[in-house]
Regions:
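FAD-binding subdomain of flavoenzyme oxidoreductases
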Residues: 155-309
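N-terminal flexible segment immediately upstream of the FAD-binding catalytic core
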Residues: 1-113, 131-165, 313-322, 370-398, ...
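Hydrophobic alpha-helical scaffolding
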Residues: 14-18, 47-51, 98-101, 168, ...
């Protein structure tokens, strides 16, 4: 496996270009009226001391467990702002005592049995992209030790049911590997969270991750057909069903459980044919309330665009998709079966009725060019820009929620204003709080700040 940065996002060889680094420094200097922008050096693993592991590896798990220094560093934190800041500064007070790399469900069961008998906490670990503290190994004093169980060696597609268009897939598979293996069968999952490159199927299920689709199939829930989860008390395995009305759903218990109930080892996942028809357009609005209303009307028209993301003017500007004067609505339709242009035409009619301005793109791959393409590229690169900013002393973080349409506009405007006031009070500096809608529903929206 490729070596990951223990102090930031991605692999060790994934660094910003020199020009990207300089661009970030120029922006920081301009925004904060600085003559010079200093950077904290990238930490070296060998210079960081860790407390000694509190347990020894049993002989029957010697091929599964390791106490390697770099592995313990890599599995101490997720990728939130506090996580990256502490990693860059070399602060690792509570690393895992051991790291497990199971290659089968049997090895997961054996590790959990040993841990349960010896009062050792086990934290499931996928790609380590968590920003909510889910993989942090500080568990307090109730356990003798901590194991971080990295699932990435369980990374195979075990079975494909083409007739039902579903596949049985191990939980440790990373997003790119999943799509590459499905591509051989002309199938796709098309679940693309921002962490796609460095997150796993099991992680998506455990966190109920939101993905590529802004409407309809918005979260991993919509693709999960069944799950298999190993717990200290046994295995929970749900049945493959297209739908069920028979009482509480065991999958609903596992999806979003954040690893507290057990280790997800595999899942049957609903798939799709690879899209061949695409229709896209970017719409600009001068008035945010009108832009929000256009987004609502499109969401309630049963058109179900794959992408229906509204960026406020500053969010668009920071992502290279505008100059800060207009709000931007990115609309994209896709299908493996039929031309989507009529759906796009209707969505644009709705947007125009609310003051939206647009020019129909001439390029075949319009979703990869122009304002839409700029935002797409910035979206993927954003975590790398953030870690570079953190090394230069910038506090940069995000938060999100969901709310019904009747409260949406007032909520967004009030939250942005109050966040700016709070930051001003604490730092005595002006700041910018931006917003984009990640998902939209007939009855509400999901703003991301």
């Amino acid at each position: 496996m490729k070596k990951r940065k223990f102090w930031g996002w991605g692999y060790e060889d994934q660094l910003l270009t020199e020009e990207e680094d300089k661009s970030i420094e120029r922006r920081i200097a301009q925004n904060f009226s600085l003559d010079e922008v200093k950077s904290v050096p990238i930490p070296k693993a060998e210079e960081i001391e860790l407390p000694k592991s509190r347990v020894s590896i049993p002989s029957n798990l010697s091929e599964v467990l390791t106490e390697d220094h770099l592995e313990r560093l890599n599995h101490s934190y997720g990728k939130s702002f506090p996580d990256i800041a502490r990693s860059i500064l070399g602060i690792f007070p509570s690393p895992p005592d051991l790291v497990a790399y199971p290659k089968s469900q049997t090895e997961v069961e054996s590790t959990l049995d040993w841990a349960d008998q010896n009062k050792i906490a086990v934290i499931p670990y996928g790609g380590g992209s968590s920003v909510c503290g889910g993989v942090e190994t500080d568990v307090g004093d109730d356990f003798r030790a901590v194991i971080s169980m990295d699932m990435r060696k369980m990374d195979k597609i075990l079975e494909i049911d083409k007739e039902s268009r579903a596949a049985r897939i191990e939980a440790g598979i990373l997003g790119p590997d999943l799509e590459n293996q499905l591509k051989e069968h002309d199938l796709t999952l098309r679940h693309f969270p921002q962490s796609f490159e460095h997150s796993t199927l099991g992680g998506w299920i455990a966190t109920r991750s939101g993905g590529h689709y802004a409407t309809l199939y918005t979260h991993i829930d919509d693709f999960v057909e069944s799950t298999t989860t190993v717990t200290p008390s046994g295995v929970i395995e749900s049945r493959r069903l297209p739908g069920s009305g028979a009482g509480p759903s065991p999958d609903r218990m596992i999806i979003g459980s954040e690893g507290v109930l057990g280790v997800i080892t595999e899942s049957w996942i609903r798939l799709q044919n690879r899209p061949t028809f695409r229709s896209s357009c970017s719409v600009h609005f001068s008035d945010y309330a009108q832009a929000l209303n256009a987004t609502r009307l499109i969401s309630q028209a049963a058109l179900f665009p794959a992408n229906c993301r509204l960026l406020d003017a500053n969010e668009a500007m920071f992502n290279g998709a505008g100059d800060g004067s207009k709000h931007l609505l990115i609309i994209n339709f896709e299908s493996a079966d039929h031309d989507m242009q009529p759906w796009l035409d209707r969505a644009l009619e709705i947007a125009k009725s609310e003051g939206g301005e647009f020019e129909l793109p001439k390029e075949k791959d319009a979703h990869k060019s122009g304002a839409s393409g700029n935002w797409r590229n910035s979206f993927i690169r954003a975590p790398y820009y953030r870690e570079a900013s953190i090394r230069r002393g910038i506090v940069q973080d995000t938060f999100e929620t969901s709310i019904t349409w009747d409260k949406g506009y007032e909520f967004i405007e009030t939250l942005k204003r109050r966040a700016q006031e709070a930051i001003k009070e604490i730092t005595n500096r002006d700041t910018t709080v931006t917003c984009r809608l990640t998902h939209t529903y007939p009855d509400g929206l999901a703003p991301y700040f």
